[in-house]
Amino acid sequence: HSVGEAAMGIQWHVLAMFGPSFFTGRLMDRFGKRRITALGLILIAASGALALMGLALTHFWGALVLLGLGWNFGFIGATALLTEAYRPSERAKVQALNDFLVFGTVAVASFGSGQLLHSVGWDGINLGMLPLVVVVLALLAWQGLRQRQQMTARG
């Protein structure tokens, strides 16, 4: 594929990452933070599945767009859930620490991404993220069930 085609895919990916931010908060208010976070994780899994289906430009672009949308819903939803777990006076510091850890990890990981691709391959990367998505979805479901049980116990 050409550099222009790759650049177009990255442009749509970045748009998918940040464009939905204008309405993600309203979606969380309407459907719940946990559901939107779960939707983000499902979209990330779908991006991996699409990437595994082939190496055509449409697979690449589609996977990047799904990954961007998944990141938006997953990251914003999870950040909202995280800050909800703390007192109002602590929330800004917790969010700042979370952002530092997340983006610091991304920066460090970007240095090893080429080596990871070389050692496990395209399919390995896309298959490797699926168990992580399943674990986080299971934790979200467990947290939601626990919260419902606590609310039921309170009456």
Report each predicted region and the residues it spans.
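A late C-terminal transmembrane helix in Major Facilitator Superfamily
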Residues: 90-119
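Multi-pass alpha-helical transporter architecture, strongest
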Residues: 130-155
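Intracellular juxtamembrane helix-capping segments at the cytosolic ends
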Residues: 73-87
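Structural signature of the two symmetry-related core transmembrane helices
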Residues: 35-50, 130
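Paired small-residue
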Residues: 58-66
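Loop-to-transmembrane helix entry
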Residues: 1-16
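Helix-to-loop junctions at the C-terminal end of transmembrane segments
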Residues: 19-33, 117
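A membrane-interface helix-boundary motif in multi-pass transporters
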Residues: 115-133
